[in-house]
Swiss-Prot record:
Entry's Gene Ontology cellular component terms: cytosol
Protein name: AMP phosphorylase
Catalytic activity, reaction form: AMP + phosphate = alpha-D-ribose 1,5-bisphosphate + adenine; CMP + phosphate = cytosine + alpha-D-ribose 1,5-bisphosphate; UMP + phosphate = alpha-D-ribose 1,5-bisphosphate + uracil
Top-level taxon of the source organism: Archaea
Keywords from the UniProt entry: Glycosyltransferase, Transferase
Family classification: Belongs to the thymidine/pyrimidine-nucleoside phosphorylase family. Type 2 subfamily.
Location of the active site: D256 (proton donor)
Lineage: Archaea, Methanobacteriati, Methanobacteriota, Thermococci, Thermococcales
Biological process annotations from GO: AMP catabolic process; pyrimidine deoxyribonucleoside metabolic process; pyrimidine nucleobase metabolic process
Length: 503
């Protein structure tokens, strides 16, 4: 069926083809059917939506399609019903617990990227991985398939280093220190980061306070080959595009299949051309990996996967039992990171973790002797070389290299929670801190978040400040206060924890 393109000002997060009732009847198409939209140069797939607002002979194309493909108003395309993809049969095989072949995994990933698989089929695939898992062969095939269906970066400056945290710890602005330290030592580190999904601030959200993070692959190549580093948002790039679609299914189902997590992380490192990769695995209460033995098992999988991809991988199991530094939220974290890198000193948890991770990378890259990486990283931080490199990164990405911490606007609607009793801080709940910061408006409101006045192990007196909530509106502040009162974000206990008498 021939149809003229009509561009619709609609965004749904899906590839949809809007057609008239008359055309649907003539073509024997029903809502939700998969169709091919063909031109002389390309074929894409979409789900049928029948609409009275579309005239016979037209096909409505949404912004979602236009973000990936170019169509012009009135362009003539061919609309063809599509059969169920062969990859659906492969998904059923995995649902039945069978091992998939390389070509089968490649077909599934290709069909996800081309939108031949619908949301329910992608969800079935993700669920099958959660239930039946993947062996290391399958994970390696999935990783390369995810990378090779998207763009690949080729940087001439070698060696190429990379670092990734699997997340879960609030206030993790560590890479804003790690990347400049490593680059200042002469290594190349093109760092792509994510925006927050369930956290109060992703690294990209924090960096965006200092400089633009949305750049094309060509711009990234130019920046990195000039100064050796970048801090950009990976979501603006076509890196491992299947990942975004599987993440939607994971989020909806509240699952995170281990094999898919490994492939998701390493496919982006593979696409960036990373040769030496450091994986940070925070461990502790309230993070993704709570037990050290589970962290060690995951570390072995990352290392083995790296070998199969031709990458040298090391892992760092780090303490994740409380937030890093004293701030949570984009602007608050950017301010704290900038203060630390300018002064060459700052909160112990931030400096220790940043120099620890950077030190490992310096040793991996061969610029520091074994066991001396952390010392070298601290020297680079304290000397001001890391700050100078951060200024270069900010300038090349289009920001003001002379920005100062006091220039960063913070939410001016505040409320401080105080200790109701004297004692010692025995616990700071990561999930509660994140929930309160998000209720305050983070990460969408850059100035929203939390300033912690205490850390675990510190002694407090009654009425001492515990944490301050920052918001950009009174309504958001009220929501955060309500959220904080419902939870126990900070626990205070005396030296006597419990009294037990005669029974």
């Amino acid at each position: 069926m021939k149809a003229k393109v009509r561009i619709l000002d609609i965004e749904t997060g899906r590839f949809l083809a809007f057609i008239s009732e008359e055309d649907a009847k003539n073509a024997k198409l029903h809502p939700g059917d998969l169709v091919k939209i063909e031109t002389a140069k390309r074929t894409i797939y979409g789900d049928v939506v029948i609409s009275k607002t579309i005239n016979p002979g037209e096909i409505g194309v949404t912004k979602d399609i236009l973000r990936s493909y170019t169509f012009s108003e009135g362009e003539v395309v061919n609309l063809v019903p599509s059969e169920t993809p062969e990859s659906v049969r492969y998904i059923r095989r995995k649902m039945n617990g069978q091992k998939l072949k390389k070509v089968e995994i490649e077909a599934i990933v290709k069909d996800i990227v081309n939108r031949k698989l619908r949301d329910i089929e992608i969800s079935s695939f993700v669920t099958s991985l959660e239930i039946n898992g993947l062996d290391m062969d399958e994970i390696a095939w999935l990783t390369t398939a995810m990378a090779e269906t998207g763009d690949m970066l080729d940087i001439d400056r070698k060696p190429i280093m990379d670092v990734h945290s699997i997340g879960g710890v609030p206030g993790n602005k560590t890479n804003i220190l790690v990347v400049p330290i490593v680059a200042a030592a002469g290594l190349t580190i093109p760092k792509t980061s994510s925006r927050a999904i369930t956290s109060a601030a992703g690294t990209a959200d924090v960096v965006e306070v200092l400089a633009p993070v949305t750049h094309s692959l060509d711009e990234i190549k130019r920046i990195v080959e000039k100064i050796g580093a970048c801090l950009v948002w990976g979501g603006a790039l076509n890196l491992a595009p299947a990942d975004d679609l599987t993440i939607k299914a994971e989020r909806a189902l509240s699952i995170d299949p281990r094999g898919l997590m490994l492939a998701s992380i390493m496919s982006k490192k593979y696409a960036m051309g990373s040769q030496y990769v450091l994986i940070d695995i925070p461990t502790g209460e309230g993070v993704k990996v709570e037990k050290v033995e589970d962290a060690r098992s995951l570390a072995k999988d990352f290392i083995e996967l790296g070998k199969r991809l031709g990458q040298y991988v090391e892992t760092a199991i780090t303490y994740g039992g409380q937030p890093i530094g004293h701030t949570v939220g984009p602007a608050l974290e950017a301010k704290e990171a900038l203060e630390t890198i300018i002064e060459g000193k700052g909160p112990g948890s931030l400096v220790e973790k940043a120099t620890g991770l950077a030190g490992i990378l310096l040793e991996m890259g061969g610029v520091a002797p074994a066991g001396m990486g952390k010392k070298m990283a601290k020297e680079i931080l304290e000397s001001g070389k890391a700050y100078e490199k951060l200024k270069e990164i900010i300038e090349e990405q289009g920001g003001d290299p002379n920005i100062k911490p006091e220039d960063i606007p913070i939410g001016d609607k505040t409320y401080t929670f105080v200790a109701q009793t004297s004692g010692y801080i025995t616990r700071i709940d990561n999930k509660a801190i994140t929930a309160i910061a998000r209720a305050a408006g983070a990460p969408e409101d850059k100035g929203a978040g939390i300033m912690l006045h205490v850390k675990v192990g510190e002694k407090v007196k009654e009425r001492d400040p515990l944490f301050t909530v920052h918001a950009e509106s009174g309504t958001r502040l009220d929501q955060a206060i309500i959220q904080a009162r419902r939870m126990e974000p900070i626990r205070i206990e005396g030296m006597v924890l419990q009294r037990i008498g005669n029974i």
